Amino acid sequence: MGEVQREKVAVIIGPTAVGKTKLSIDLAKALNGEIISGDSMQIYRTMDIGTAKVTQAEMDGIPHYMVDIKNPEDSFSVAEFQERVRKHIREITERGKLPIIVGGTGLYIQSVLFDYQFTDDAGDVIYREQMEKLALERGVEYVHKKLQEVDPESAERIHANNVRRVIRALEIFHTTGEKMSDQIEKQEKELLYDVSLIGLTMDREMLYDRINLRVDLMMEQGLLEEVEGLYNRGIRDCQSIQAIGYKEIYDYFENRASLEDAVSQLKTNSRRYAKRQLTWFRNKMDVTWFDVTDGEKTSEILRYIEGKLQVKSNNSK
């Protein structure tokens, strides 16, 4: 018997504000594709402006998945993302379409593409109970700070009030000596799909200017009112509110910052995040990069995907 043919998947990654959304829709039109969001925050309903969620108009009739699937108060894990996205890949492929994953949440995308197993073994019960006791006696912030010291990446992703996940991350570090956020690295990294992995990049100053402009546009579009709606619903200590664009404006509503300072902090955090995204992708994944400083490279990228995945675009028929 011959080798089982792997499903073909195109993946578009890159920092925030680099132009992934438009490119993905152009590619989906040309390649008979459907889009899966690889963004850990666009899953939340009513959080549209701050997550730069693709609009119905931008979708232009192209089906999108993993958008608006959770309420802001719901928690969401990498394991659930992996399971859902792999199901979408199967279903899109069965319909004779090309799955296109687009987003900037590297760990989530990597968990889908590679043979990454999520373990939830018994761990160290005594240590876990010690941490639970500490959380009760000294507060959740104290335990979260301990996580920040050993695994800042996980601490950034997990809200202090999500005590179970904070302690789980601490427990993994305690028992293995490795960060939960680095677990992927010690597993066999075998690609499960026939993947074309495209990265968009541009001149740093230009990217930072685009990020600053995007934040200004978000404020014009009603980001303040969007966050106020969440705040008035009593949504406080949730995973979703840890997102850049929300935690900064929450500081304004909690009287911890002026609106001007909150917006300034949002710009700073967005620029830092873009820098971290680029570093992560360059260190962790084998990406073919396209520099879009001087404009779109849609035709060039389309030709590359056609060659890599042996698929034909509408343009080449």
Swiss-Prot record:
Source organism: Bacillus cereus (strain G9842)
One Pfam family, short name: IPPT
One of the record's GO molecular function terms: ATP binding
Stretches for region Interaction with substrate tRNA: 39-42
PANTHER family xref list: TRNA DIMETHYLALLYLTRANSFERASE (PTHR11088:SF60)
UniProtKB keywords: ATP-binding, Magnesium, Nucleotide-binding, Transferase, tRNA processing
Function recorded in the entry: Catalyzes the transfer of a dimethylallyl group onto the adenine at position 37 in tRNAs that read codons beginning with uridine, leading to the formation of N6-(dimethylallyl)adenosine (i(6)A).
HAMAP family: IPP_trans
Gene name of the record: miaA
Signal sequence residues: none
Cofactor(s) needed for function: Mg(2+)
Top enzyme category: transferase
Binding site for substrate: T16, A17, V18, G19, K20, T21
Matching InterPro entries: Dimethylallyltransferase, IPT, P-loop_NTPase
Complex and partners: Monomer.
EC number, as in UniProt: 2.5.1.75
UniProt record similarity statement: Belongs to the IPP transferase family.
Presence of the UniProt keyword Nucleotide-binding in the record: yes
Residues under site feature: Interaction with substrate tRNA: T105, R128
Known catalytic reactions: adenosine(37) in tRNA + dimethylallyl diphosphate = N(6)-dimethylallyladenosine(37) in tRNA + diphosphate
SUPFAM superfamilies, per the entry: P-loop containing nucleoside triphosphate hydrolases (SSF52540)
GO biological process: tRNA modification
Protein name according to UniProt: tRNA dimethylallyltransferase
